[in-house]
Amino acid sequence: MDDFQAALKQQLERNAELQRRRAEAEQEMDRARQAAEEQARAEAQRQQDVRNQRHADLVEHLSDVARQLKAAQPESFIVRTGWTESGEEFLAKISTRQTEPSRSLLIELDRDDDQVLARWITGVGNTVELWRLLEVTPAMLAELVLQVADEPLWRSATAPPPFPRSPR
């Protein structure tokens, strides 16, 4: 019986040691999972901060170039810019006056949905393009606004001009 008692005691001690190791391993897995979740949250926040900054930069640039276009020829362009009631989207609509073909460019910078929408509504057709915020540069927005004013481009147009390509 003494051999049995010793073997039983040894088995129970081994079981207890395995249980302790399992508990430690589970705690380590929990710590690793929590660290990974925290890292993912921090990265998501960093990306959101980058998108918010890009949105602010694009809003400022689009407002500036639209204002410059309007100031250059106020009798030729109707320019409307502003925020939606929710404060989520910034809109710019630029239309021509007394030009052929007639044309309107609508640009929507949507911070919360991480999108930039550009839509041509013209006498020669309509087109729409959608990008992610980080794909759009201030230069692309300036190119779109310049296209509104490019009379030689529109004089023989049979369709709206192609949208600028993202450098990404």
State what each model feature region is.
Residues R132-R168:
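Extended, charge-rich C-terminal regions with high alpha-helical propensity
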Residues M1-R22:
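Short linear clamp-binding motif
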